[in-house]
Amino acid sequence: PPPKERLHGRNSDWKHLYNADIISMPDKWEYPWYASWDLAFHCISLAIVDPAFAKRQLILFLREWYMHPNGQIPAYEWALGDVNPPVHAWAALRIYRIEAKRKGVADRAFLERVFHKLLLNFTWWVNRKDDEGNNVFEGGFLGLDNIGVFDRSKELPEGGHLEQSDGTSWMAMFSLNMLAIALELAREDKVYEDVASKFFEHFVYIADAMNNLGAECTELWNERDGFYYDVLHMQGHQIPIRLRSMVGLIPLFAVETLEYDWIKDLPDFLRRTEWFLQNRPDLTDDIACLQQPGSNGRRLLALVSEERLRRVLRVMLSESEFLSDYGIRALSRYYKANPYIVEAGGETYRVDYEPGESRSGMFGGNSNWRGPIWFPANYLMIESLQKFDYFFGENFRVEFPTGSGKMLTLWEVSLELEKRLCNIFLKDENGRRAVFGNTEKFQTDEHWRDHLLFFEYFHGDHGRGLGANHQTGWTGLIGKVLQQLGEYENTQPNRKFGVTINTTTDELLRAAGIEK
């Protein structure tokens, strides 16, 4: 038997766990252990080439010998009970749709199977992470490592708690993912209309809390700055953490566009949502909540209103803030010359813009969300912009980049961001790849220069690959990005992009093992 000191240590409450399966690893050398939120992104790329394996991977983590009896999905092997963003439902729905498009037949049994287990996971989140029952989610490590002012996996100053913009946004996104799955299942089984209504109401309550907690005087939306922030509560007072980071962009991930011709055939769901909108307008004033028809009569559910969407995008698409030649940075470049400093609990905390490797030892030091470009966040942002565009259509345009005077639709913006991600890997006019930086052997040696490495994350200014470098799983999302660009170029051969690349996508498609 193990020594007594191990009976109550790390992972001690996961005694049910029995893992002896083939699992997609984040990295076969530097991270040869599973991580559940990484896996969800792996499965999107895997679904292009092997949807059956991708589905089995998602199902596996919901089985009784993985999922905790209380509904928590194991986070990663070092600390199974840590908390990562709830993206399993999103991945399941995306894989379901990818396979349906590819094969012409949807695997309803798969979607139904994961949905029932994800109900347990959703309930765990609501019971464990909504500390005060006010639909604001706080506490714990949420996968963005050192992005915040504080180490969010440890005790905060003066025993305070952090009401997290990203934690609450992830739950709003989770609610909409579950709503979308329930509506898909309700097309053939009306029983799912009831649970769809449940997730609609969950979303509305979370969105209301996110935008204005009213009596608690907590607003995660900052009207002056036009951005979302965390709020630190300490001994009767609160401090807004006015740090412009990916934390304030994640609210855009909570979006779903619905076909009205589809939901009008679900009378119970439609009746309940219409009652809610008529009788609780106080909860829906600051969000997009089915009220107005959009392009082709579609309806929008989103955490951000149209006006707030424009304001957040104005910051995100500024090259002096988040927009890099290689994607969206995790932290605004503004802090390069203007470090963010806040005092709390008698201590001074500081965050600098660090586009390369972290100068902090937080989370081992070999990880950095204070400036670099990360594929999972960029991919979710691209997809969210496309969902918004599906509702708003041609008439909704924003400056890209901010201040340029060039107005693009959100679909066009999403494609420009995809091109910038591709620019990490593709050769520039001098035949050099940003991903290899100043490593001359990789840039020029004929035996190495065309062997692309999908690094963990990338330099926020130069695109150089950083962190783990041996085919890190979630950077494989570039394959899905390239597939979409390839399909679009085939249907729009004369389309001109604002970001010029000096080769077609064929090169990287081949490297990713994908044929156009």
Where are the regions that the model predicts?
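Acidic, mature catalytic/reactive cores of soluble proteins
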Residues: 1-516
